[in-house]
Amino acid sequence: MIRSILDNDLYKFTMQMAVLELFPNARAEYRFINRGAQSFTNDFVNELRRIINKDISKIALSEDEYIWLKDNCPFFKPSYIEYLKNFRFNPEEVKIVLTEDNELELCIEGPWHSSILWEIVLMSTISELYFTVTDNKGEEISASNANDPENTLMEEYSSFIGDMGKELDAKGCIFSEFGTRRRRGFKLHDKVVEVLHELDSFSGTSNVYFAKKYGVRPIGTIGHEWIMGNSALVGLRNANKFAFDNWVKVYKGDLSIALSDTFGSKPFFQNFSIGLAKIYDGVRHDSGDPIKFADEVIEHYKKLGIDPMKKVLVFSDSLHVSDAVKLKEYCSGRINCSFGIGTTLTNNPDFFSYNPPLNMVIKLHKIDGIPVVKLSDSVEKATGDKDALRVANYIFGRKGLDEQF
């Protein structure tokens, strides 16, 4: 399942380095949320525990990986790469419970700088383990080729993804693969990047392991976690600005795509000053109406006297090919755009319609015992303690203090 410490998304490593530099003593708590109707079993939980305790705990940065990071990721400081060389996952940071209703409860607690790497690793493990247990291969493959189900599945999925990639390429949609967390499995993920990596419009992958394997660019900058964690230290109202300023302190203008929706786009634009707008190469959209947001971003840059055509808007909210094509056409000549496409590539819900991807997240819940929240521009994506969400919605003028979230 997890073959390497680099089998993770780049932004987990970039945020880890920033945490080590600015908040080395902070402690974090994360919670697993299953938004779907899937249930789990004792056998599933026992195998998940075994993988965490026996397999993931042994993963370490190899000498080859160490050299590759030094040669290909200049934004990582030598001291951080040394830290990563000595890093080991600590299974004691992960607590798993199966409830009487067969729901999975998972909590991660530990120093922020170490516990930060668990999220993607656990989500991709949970996903692959779930589909290993529940998939009926007979439904995935052509009956005529049932003698070799795994290879037939790979061939059919390769063709399916290849057609998607060619369509994006033909339409000039610059895109990257963002699908580690909810992938069907490691081998299928590998095949996806293999199929896509030679396309002119394929800009890279968020997965550092596959970026190394296929010689493409590792893609990623800031996740919601960075902004949420910073909010625990300065409060919600100016958390975006504090988080973006801190990112600049660490990376000096590298990796500079600002994530817009942690507390909704309105407070983002209030905090995204002319200084930040000039330093950051662009903005990422991850929830809400993308057309409306594109207009707002373009207008914001123009108000600040910045040419939008010198910036980039990255769309990453549950994208399908048709979405990307539509957005590319809408933004053409107004602002540069690119696309981060995740589950659609690594666990496509149309291809696997009989047993679709898990709708799950693992989100930061507390920093140093202080609850943190994500509000989003899509109500269903909000996460956090109910009382903390209620207060956050009030602070940002979205709801009255006594209104239910």
Curated annotation (Swiss-Prot):
Q: Which reaction does it catalyse?
A: nicotinate + 5-phospho-alpha-D-ribose 1-diphosphate + ATP + H2O = nicotinate beta-D-ribonucleotide + ADP + phosphate + diphosphate
Chain's role: Catalyzes the synthesis of beta-nicotinate D-ribonucleotide from nicotinate and 5-phospho-D-ribose 1-phosphate at the expense of ATP.
Highest taxon above the source species: Archaea
| Gene Ontology biological-process entries | NAD biosynthetic process via the salvage pathway
Q: Name the Enzyme Commission number(s) assigned to this protein.
A: 6.3.4.21
Alphabetically ordered keywords of this record: Ligase, Phosphoprotein, Pyridine nucleotide biosynthesis
Kindly list the positions at which Phosphohistidine occurs in this protein.
224
Q: Which family does it belong to?
A: Belongs to the NAPRTase family.
Tell me the route in metabolism or biology where this protein functions.
Cofactor biosynthesis; NAD(+) biosynthesis; nicotinate D-ribonucleotide from nicotinate: step 1/1
What GO cellular component entries does it have?
cytosol
The answer to keyword Ligase applying to this record is yes
PTM annotation? Transiently phosphorylated on a His residue during the reaction cycle. Phosphorylation strongly increases the affinity for substrates and increases the rate of nicotinate D-ribonucleotide production. Dephosphorylation regenerates the low-affinity form of the enzyme, leading to product release.
MF terms (GO), sorted A to Z:
nicotinate phosphoribosyltransferase activity
Q: What's its top-level EC category?
A: ligase
Source organism of the structure: Methanococcoides burtonii (strain DSM 6242 / NBRC 107633 / OCM 468 / ACE-M)
Q: Tell me which HAMAP family the record gives.
A: NAPRTase
Report what the protein is called. Nicotinate phosphoribosyltransferase
